[in-house]
């Protein structure tokens, strides 16, 4: 997305840790300090359904009685299947933040952000069914955004609330050095 600084700070690379390594770390904190809740702040933790499912299955296999949350606003399009949502819930996931950013297709093009509304509504329904709370994040004030765009965003906020999203987070765009939008 044009407002994100991550591509600049990571040299356009995303490096994943293996499912085993991720769960090893969770198990370490659980056993060493009795930490039972983990907030995942990965740039895009669900980028691979296979990897997400492997992490969930490993948590289940080890019988780790933990809770975990995806707090960083993941791209809903990266969660490909309802099976992934089911495994996430079984492994202790209780919260997923998604990032529609705007209800305006014009603004979405301006910020280079895809969002599949129908897929989001379907997954929100599944998340509700399995006990995962959901948050939808929106960003206001993008350069080129007009009143009509904000009205479309407001409509999407209400539509997602009706679809069952648990909470809405509103942010003001901040042009951070290193992001496209700053330039």
How would you describe each model-predicted region?
Residues 1-134, 155:
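Radical SAM [4Fe-4S] cluster-binding motif and immediate context
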Residues 95, 137, 174:
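Short glycine- and Lys/Arg-enriched binding-loop motifs that mark or flank ligand-binding interfaces
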Residues 132-138, 160-162:
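Conserved beta-strand->loop/alpha-helix structural units within folded catalytic cores of enzymes
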Residues 84, 144-161:
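Catalytic cores of alpha/beta
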Residues 119, 156-159, 173-178:
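C-terminal, active-site-flanking charged/polar segments
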């Amino acid at each position: 997305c044009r407002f994100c600084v991550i591509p600049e700070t990571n040299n356009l690379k995303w490096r994943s840790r293996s499912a085993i390594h991720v769960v090893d770390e969770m198990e370490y904190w659980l056993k060493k300090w009795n930490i039972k809740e983990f907030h995942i702040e990965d740039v895009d933790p669900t980028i691979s359904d296979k990897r997400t499912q492997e992490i969930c299955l490993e948590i289940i296999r080890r019988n780790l009685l933990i809770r975990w949350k995806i707090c960083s606003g993941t791209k809903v399009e990266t969660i490909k299947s309802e099976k992934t949502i089911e495994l996430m819930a079984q492994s202790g996931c209780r919260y997923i933040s998604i990032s529609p950013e705007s209800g305006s297709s014009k603004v979405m093009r301006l910020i280079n952000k895809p969002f599949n509304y129908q897929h989001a509504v379907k997954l929100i329904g599944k998340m509700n069914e399995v006990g995962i709370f959901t948050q939808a994040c929106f960003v206001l004030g993008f350069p080129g955004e007009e009143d009509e765009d904000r009205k479309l965003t407001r409509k999407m906020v209400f539509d997602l609330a009706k679809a069952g999203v648990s909470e809405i987070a509103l942010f003001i765009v901040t042009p951070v050095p290193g992001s496209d939008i700053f330039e």
